[in-house]
């Protein structure tokens, strides 16, 4: 059976709300989460039918924006 090689660019927008005391601490927390995701090298997606499909990650990049204080 022949195989196919696909290069896919996937942009995910993830909003994380945390209890950090400052924008710097908040950015540090989110950076740590992104770096751990970089190390995982695999992500799993839950399909509508309940099955799970795993995808290998390579050359992943991230950018953190809009670290701001939330109103209480």
Swiss-Prot record:
InterPro entries: YopT, YopT_sf. Pfam families: Yopt (PF09467). Homodimer. This is SPbeta prophage-derived uncharacterized protein YopT. The gene is yopT.
């Amino acid at each position: 059976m022949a195989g196919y090689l696909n290069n896919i660019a996937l942009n995910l927008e993830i909003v994380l709300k945390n209890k950090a005391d400052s924008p710097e601490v908040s950015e540090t927390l989110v950076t740590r989460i992104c770096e751990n995701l970089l190390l995982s090298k695999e992500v799993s997606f839950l399909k509508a039918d309940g099955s799970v499909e795993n995808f290998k990650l390579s050359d992943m990049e991230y950018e953190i924006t809009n670290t701001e204080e939330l109103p209480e």
